[in-house]
Amino acid sequence: MASRIVTREEMLQRVARFKELTPSSRPLVDAVLPQFNRQIFSIIGGGVTEDASMKVPITAVDGFHLSIIKAGPKKGTGLHNHRTVEVFMPLTGTWSVQWGDDGENELTIGQWDVISVPTGIMRGFRNESAEEAYLLALVGGDDPGRVAWATNVMSAVREKGFDLDANGKIVEIGR
């Protein structure tokens, strides 16, 4: 069977140059909380981001979404769940991954290690390094759906004056 023909122009639409990416500083609603402050570079597909202004360079999604997370020391994400597998690989630094309804389970992964977090469980991650670090993240599926946040995370977010609208995007609600 002959392969299909893809032009250079078509292939260029599937290239993302890191130096040209603009990260979101509020990629998900939990980032309004200091301990979850981080940036996300969405590269292939929008993943589960809740930032309506996020620009994604590669919009052709073929079964997965790819992003890079940049976080300072002890920064990460709040406990959350979504309907797809999530895969993490530290590009730099050391990261912890938590899982369980209260994040009661935890393990640490280092540069180039990989963890595949299964569906149906709360999960979170944190940069355990003394310096800023990068984490590669893949979310499975063409449509990974929306994030389901732990109750305590959403309560803290609302106390800061933020919430999610009907489309799952971040909105300011005031205090």
Tell what function each PLM region has.
Residues K55-T59, T77-H82, W99, E106-T108, ...:
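Short histidine-centered beta-strand/loop micro-motifs
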Residues A2-E10, G124-R175:
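Double-stranded beta-helix
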Residues M1-G63, D165-R175:
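A short, N-terminal "cap"/entry segment at the start of jelly-roll beta-barrel domains
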Residues V48-A52, H65-N81:
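Conserved short histidine dyad/triad with adjacent acidic residue
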Residues N81, V85-Q111, I121:
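A short beta-strand-loop-beta hairpin characteristic of the jelly-roll/cupin
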Residues A71-G72, I109-S129, G140:
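Conserved metal-binding segment of the jelly-roll/cupin
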Residues I68, G78, V87, V114, ...:
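Short, surface-exposed charged micro-motifs
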